[in-house]
UniProtKB/Swiss-Prot annotation:
Molecular functions (GO terms): rRNA binding; structural constituent of ribosome
GO cellular component, one term: cytosolic large ribosomal subunit
Protein name (record): Large ribosomal subunit protein uL6
Assembly: Part of the 50S ribosomal subunit.
GO biological process terms, semicolon-separated: cytoplasmic translation
Keywords: Ribonucleoprotein, Ribosomal protein, RNA-binding, rRNA-binding
Coiled-coil annotated residue ranges, if any: none
Function statement: This protein binds to the 23S rRNA, and is important in its secondary structure. It is located near the subunit interface in the base of the L7/L12 stalk, and near the tRNA binding site of the peptidyltransferase center.
Record family assignment: Belongs to the universal ribosomal protein uL6 family.
Native species: Thermotoga neapolitana (strain ATCC 49049 / DSM 4359 / NBRC 107923 / NS-E)
InterPro entries documented for this protein: Ribosomal_uL6-like (IPR000702), Ribosomal_uL6-like_a/b-dom_sf (IPR036789), Ribosomal_uL6_a/b-dom (IPR020040), Ribosomal_uL6_bac-type (IPR019906)
Keyword RNA-binding: yes
Keyword field contains Ribonucleoprotein: yes
Length: 184
């Protein structure tokens, strides 16, 4: 368990957190997120704070404490990410590097020319927003941290950065270590 899980999660103004039967629902100005949890921990709301405490009923022997503490830290992070998501949201930026490589939005699909003989078409999920501010830049945003990261990773997987030339799709700020080519 991380030491962070011993601290409560503050609930900001305009955010409501509901806990019932292993399900946590977080509502905020940007939307609503729901997550199911296993009964290894007790999730309680006291004085505008969310506490994640070990469920002692799940501990049958001493070795079970390890699993309970593990879930306590994990669930603390998941609930905190939900609260941040419904208040601020999450964003991942990708850049396309390469001559003739570009992206454009056509309705609910992202069409990318990535050096293949055909354009790559990606259907955008409904819970994530994708913008193309420039032909070589893609911005993925949403309230669910996991979904935003998953969609960004799927887009990047169409043409990951080449280790010799550096061409491909990369995260903004990602450093691609380039290998040296063959010596003649």
């Amino acid at each position: 368990m991380s030491r962070l899980a011993k601290k409560p999660i503050n609930i900001p103004q305009g955010v409501t957190v509901e806990v019932n039967d292993g399900t946590v629902k977080v509502r905020g100005p940007k939307g609503e997120l729901t997550q199911d949890f296993l009964p290894y921990v007790k999730i309680e709301i006291e004085d505008g704070k969310v506490w994640i405490r070990p469920n002692e009923a799940q501990v049958r022997r001493k070795s079970d404490w390890r699993k309970v503490k593990m879930f306590q830290g994990t669930y603390w992070s998941l609930i905190r990410n939900m609260v941040i998501g419904v208040t601020e949201g999450y964003k991942k930026e990708l850049e396309i590097v390469g001559i003739g490589y570009r992206a454009q939005l056509q309705g609910n699909t992202l069409v990318m020319n990535l050096g293949y003989a055909h354009p790559v078409v990606y259907e955008i999920p409904s819970d994530v927003k994708v913008e193309v501010p420039a032909p070589n830049r893609i911005v993925v945003s949403g309230i669910d941290k996991q979904r935003v990261g998953q969609v960004a990773a799927e887009i990047r997987a169409f043409r990951p950065p080449n280790v010799y030339t550096g061409k491909g799709i990369r995260y903004v700020g990602e450093v691609v270590r380039q290998k040296e080519g063959k010596k003649a």
